[in-house]
Amino acid sequence: MSLASQDYQDLAEFRFQLRQFLHFSEMEAREHSLEPQQHQALLAIKGLPAGTKPTIGELAHRLFLRHHSVVELTDRLEGAGFIRRKQGKDDRRQILIYLTPRGAARLRSLSVAHREELAVKGPELVRALQSVIRASRRSHAA
């Protein structure tokens, strides 16, 4: 499969739009006195699908981090009062992670800011993604 110059431009624009949002997210986290990974962890905990337990292993999976890195991350979050750990009811060896009221409030503030940014910048991101998808479909149909 060959790619035209426009294909590279479309991919580059999509990558730029993604990176622009990620940059906003990183800066916004820092303005709220969190490191970007801490913000991502709070969001991952709060946003887990129903029925998914908030374990270190699940967080490692969702954050693309190693187990020991998530342990260190949760240690820092717990020390700052953003999360609490609780022993599992069914499996006493299992440690579950929950947001504290302080963590939930910080995440809520950040999430509002992210939604506002996406309301403004989201259409550009969607357009860039749609350009890549359309080109991919055209090349697969040919």
Can you describe what each PLM-predicted range is?
Residues 56, 74-75:
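Short, hydrophobic-biased segments on the C-terminal half of alpha helices
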Residues 134-142:
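Short, charged, intrinsically disordered terminal tails
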Residues 1-32, 80-82, 142:
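N-terminal leader segment of winged-helix/HTH proteins
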Residues 13, 20, 40-44, 105:
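Pre-recognition alpha-helix immediately N-terminal to the DNA-recognition helix
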Residues 23-66:
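N-terminal helix-turn-helix DNA-binding core of bacterial DNA-binding proteins
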Residues 8-11, 35, 56, 115, ...:
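Short, structured helix-loop boundary elements
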Residues 75-133:
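Charged, amphipathic alpha-helical coiled-coil/dimerization segments
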